[in-house]
Amino acid sequence: MAEVSVKQLATDIDTPVDRLLQQFVDAGISKSKADDLVSESEKQTLLAHLKKQHGGDELTAPARMTLQRKTKSTISVQGTGGKNKEVQVEVRKTRTYVKRSALEDEQRQAEAEETARLEAEEKARSEAENKVRLDAEEKARREAEQARREAEEKARIEAQSKARQAPQPAKAASSTAQQEAEKMAKREAEELKRQQEQTALQKAEELAAKKAEEARLMAEQNGPRWAEEEAARAKESSDYHLTTNKHAQAAEDELDRKEETSRRTAAAAVKAPKKAGRREDDRDSRNPRARKGKRGKMAMPNAMKHGFNKPAAVVNRDVVIGETITVAELANKMAVKGVEVIKAMMKMGAMATINQVIDQETAQLVAEEMGHKVVLRRENELEEAVLSDRDETSEAKSRAPVVTIMGHVDHGKTSLLDYIRKAKVAAGEAGGITQHIGAYHVETDSGMITFLDTPGHAAFTSMRARGAKSTDIVVLVVAADDGVMPQTIEAIQHAKAAEVPIVVAVNKIDKPEADPDRVKTELARYNVMSEDWGGDSQFVHVSAKSGEGIDDLLEAILIQSEVLELKAVVDGMASGVVIESFLDKGRGPVATVLVQEGTLRQGDIVLCGLEYGRIRAMRDELGREIKEAGPSLPVEILGLSGVPSAGDEATVVRDEKKAREVALYRQGKFRDVKLARQQKAKLENMFANMTEGEVSEVNVVIKADVQGSVQAICDALVQLSTDEVKVKIVGSGVGGITETDATLAAASSAILVGFNVRADASARKVIESESLDLRYYSVIYDLIDEVKQAMSGKLAPEYRQEIIGLAEVRSVFKSPKFGAVAGCMVTEGVVKRSNRIRVLRDNVVIYEGELESLRRFKDDVNEVRNGYECGIAVKNYNDVREGDQIEVYETIEIQRTL
């Protein structure tokens, strides 16, 4: 694993750097600076040291505690003249509490000493017995061995004597005699060994009996003393309160107060036998807070009890864990402190802070490690229940195809659609290029077709992907005179990814330079094969200008839709997809929805991504009010709680309350995911964070007219970032530029960019007072180019050295003021006094510095041109020789561009 700096580790575990350095020193690890690197083994060493320190260095409570209590009360005594007066009485009590552990430690120590003594005696006795037994066995073995050898020797001598007496014995008789002698010797040896073992055993038993008698005598002598010590310890234990917790103190104090109260009540009853006084005393005894002293203060209650009882054991809980949870929330569910959870995670090898978001699996392991039962909960149960409660009993019927027109920029997509719709849409787009998704439906003789017109510019990749995702057929427009271009290839990839059939419209066929065969050949490289060549893609030659081939294109689209057998449920609750969304100043959030199933009606409750609402009004693409819309129809809906993101699914639900709950849940989940992405406390991106401070940033606040344009601009600007300059989107949104946007731009030193929107009056005041850079755009080309220029201004300039003169040393002479002075001839360019120089010897630079003096005919001059002689003194350098060259150069700053 990569090493981490002390500073980064301190940030990860949320502790000061100085404290972490001190902990390293305490653990025996040499770390003195915040930039020092910490390896994995050093982290484990520190963790082990902290565990040991926290586990062993517990604060020792005092073994004995003395409490003093003062109780103040007033009694009424009879004074002179028959009047009663109040006298204050103060009762002081002193209690001494002894910690249970202290007495128990003494008792355990005494028991341990007694046990050790008895064990030592038993061990000594057993060792003595074993030693005696082993000595006896060894002695018996040696004696038996000696006896065996003697018997064998005796038998051998007898056999030899018998052999001598019988000079010619038989061989068998000799062998038999020898065997008999060996058997006799063996029996004698065994008998001797048995006798010796019996003798040793008797001696060991006598020694053991002697040791036992000594132990009995010692116990009889010390028994009374040991009994007295045990009785003294028991008496001492019974004289003290062994518990020092608050419950025992409260119970004892309550008993003392009852005795004191009863004593005062009896004294008052004797001296004041009036009925009213008795009633007053009874009331006081029933309600101790009712009686007040002279100063009107409440008297202390008799019993100071509270309802909380400290649990005697750990309570095992059922911990409900969602998909993501923070460490603090997990600790709260388990009713423990966050520090305990962090400790448990550190023991398991995971470092986390109290606000860090952890996943469900990690939280489950931590909770089970701490002894709790885990209940895993799916966060989207309510969402699934709401979305599943739908009317889906109707039969599916044929529907109109949804056709997306895609292709490279300026290949004539919108112009082709204009001719079909008999309207001029392209002229209304800024710069003549499409920057929004346009959704239109067209009634033809053969049926209805819904068209989605997507932008062709490179910045609108997400828009094209969104269009391909919600379409049935893709019409790929390729200019016959231009061929396949980058966005054409991208459109093919989107269509292939969405598994949507492609109909190729070869546009601009009326131009003289049109070459449709080249288009077929180029598209074949990307697996778009014509039906003429055995493929499955229809190729139609059209001209958006003259209208040639338009009917053939519509017929090809309808044929393709018949092959696909497109069907959808017409009746029932509608569902669709958001094609585009924007914020209208007078109407509020407006979303363009393409209905895919069911019928969308005015008054329906719609759940749309992170937003919800009841449809207040519906309009078609021409702005006409409509009451309902069926499948494959694009409509604008009003009444949502906010501007949904383009591409979100729009679904009609039954209950507005549940729709609101689901929307709020989605917003919270989106926030959690966003926070989880922003977690920087990871070792993997440590080096990226370290170099982040060296990168210049261009902050931008973007406001656009529709949500799709905001996404496209953000993606395009982020892609401009380089290693030296980074584009940071501080804020973005849909609608006009407000005072909040201007304040955000002022706080972050950002450029305000308005795309087809303008700033209101309050925002203009802030912009003028703060001198902010506000720029309006209607074409995305201009926006990207100007942001590039702003990024170029943030680039560090490049410096280049340019040689302006060269002088050759002809002679060297000494000067008392300058040292070695070179007499030179300027051979190239100009030698200037203010510029830096290099001294070259054999075309190798040996010194780099500056001129101290430049003279011509004993006069100081600022420059000497080519072909003239001069005297040059180099500052702080005297090793100038004949034949050296002095090169004069200047540094030029060159502004870099992206």
From Swiss-Prot:
Residues 432-436 are annotated as: G2. Residues 407-414 are annotated as: G1. Residues 162-179 have a biased composition (Low complexity). InterPro entries: DNA-bd_dom_put_sf, EF-G-like_DII, EFTu-like_2, IF2_assoc_dom_bac, IF2_II, IF2_N, P-loop_NTPase, Small_GTP-bd. Residues 507-510 are annotated as: G4. Keywords: Cytoplasm, GTP-binding, Initiation factor, Nucleotide-binding, Protein biosynthesis. It is found in: Cytoplasm. GTP binds at residues 407-414, 453-457, 507-510. GO terms for molecular function: GTP binding; GTPase activity; guanosine tetraphosphate binding; translation initiation factor activity. Residues 453-456 are annotated as: G3. One of its GO terms (cellular component) is cytosol. Residues 101-161, 180-196, 203-217, 226-239, 278-287 have a biased composition (Basic and acidic residues). One of the essential components for the initiation of protein synthesis. Protects formylmethionyl-tRNA from spontaneous hydrolysis and promotes its binding to the 30S ribosomal subunits. Also involved in the hydrolysis of GTP during the formation of the 70S ribosomal complex. This is Translation initiation factor IF-2. It comes from Aeromonas salmonicida (strain A449).
